[in-house]
Amino acid sequence: MTRRIAATVILALALAPLAPAGGPVYSRFALGDILHFGSNRAYAMGITGVAFTEDGFVNIYNPASLSRLSLTRFTGGFEYVNSSIEDAGGSQRFATGSFQSLALAIPASSDDGIVIFGAVTPYSLVDYDVVVQETVAGSASTQTFSGTGGVSTLSLGTTYRPVTDLSLGLTFSYHYGAIQHRSKVDFADAAFADNELRTSQFLSGTSFTFGMTYGGLSSLLGTSSLQPLTLGLVLTTPATLSIKEERFLLTQRTADTSLVRRGTGSLPFRWGLGAAYTGAALIVSGDLVVEQWSSADFFDPPAVEVNNSLRAGLGIEFPARRDPTSYWERVAYRTGFAYHASYISINGQPVNGWSVSGGIAFPIGPDARMNLGLQVGSRGTTDNGLSKESFFKLSLSIDASEAWFLTIEED
């Protein structure tokens, strides 16, 4: 009888919102933390890069931004995150590192702006570990909640430039991944059997992204002051996810229950707008991205309220000089600010955040750079029994072209 009670308790705990615990609990809900990564350059400027269109950079958030590449380019990156979680019970610090991106873009026709590209990036991330001391069914207990995994995206796409000032892009994305949650209860009273519930979800689905950039406002309006201005648009279709869930309930002595379920969920429609003013000595860019999570479907009803999300950012870059006389004049400097209204609310309280960013691009060879990006900010609040996360993020990437491998012979 006590084992049945304990099993019922842990199943209820696994589906309920967490009490204050001092852990990074927000990635526990729905599909986890949603990531918006276009490039390390955009990362350091606090934006996604919806309106970027320059040669020499791979920014995958808007496929149209690749249409001006003149050489085959590749990029790969890694992110380190150090965060402090604070709630009414105190604070804890966590650190983790993860893969950030890998992309390759190959120009097929520079005259027509045709570029073929592929990329692998994380779409969402689940990474939490929380311990709660609580009395359950009259017995003191230690409850452990943890989760890992997320959704990744494999993208293949192409671009086309029908006229000089208009670039178009189309991306096919295959979303895949696995998310594991673990809920464990250890009882102080030997009359209760310790229990552990392991849940694994395996997800897959597809979507399309259409992108466009336009730099012809100067000609359209007859003013040369707008010549450096580019506008960007990106639209991503909803994705239907096929989901297989495996649940495994263990007690102190035996594996009690194994359950496999199949169903569907979805990723939401996403749209973004951006603008970039590209001068010789200063680049200013801003963008806005909205995801309609309120219309998305979930395999199980989330234990939190789901809202449409919004991400807005504004950044500047001091690019490398075109006629450098020293190494440091070949270095680019970046900074920016971002605000994020997330797609979840808990107890009526939105989980929103902000960040200040910066970065440096160091030349490391012919047409190759090592990019460092930094973000410092916070999300959430300690109001209404919730947690506040203060974070420090560091991104490192290598961006290079085929010119990196050329051997230059000296006379």
What are these regions (language model features)?
Residues G22-A44, A105-D411:
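Outer-membrane beta-barrel porins/channels
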Residues L18-P122:
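N-terminal, post-signal peptide beta-strand-biased segments of exported outer-membrane/organellar beta-barrel
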Residues M1-A7:
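Bacterial N-terminal signal peptides that target proteins for export
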Residues T8-P17:
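Bacterial N-terminal signal peptides
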Residues A16, R73, V185-F187:
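Short alpha-helix boundary/capping motifs
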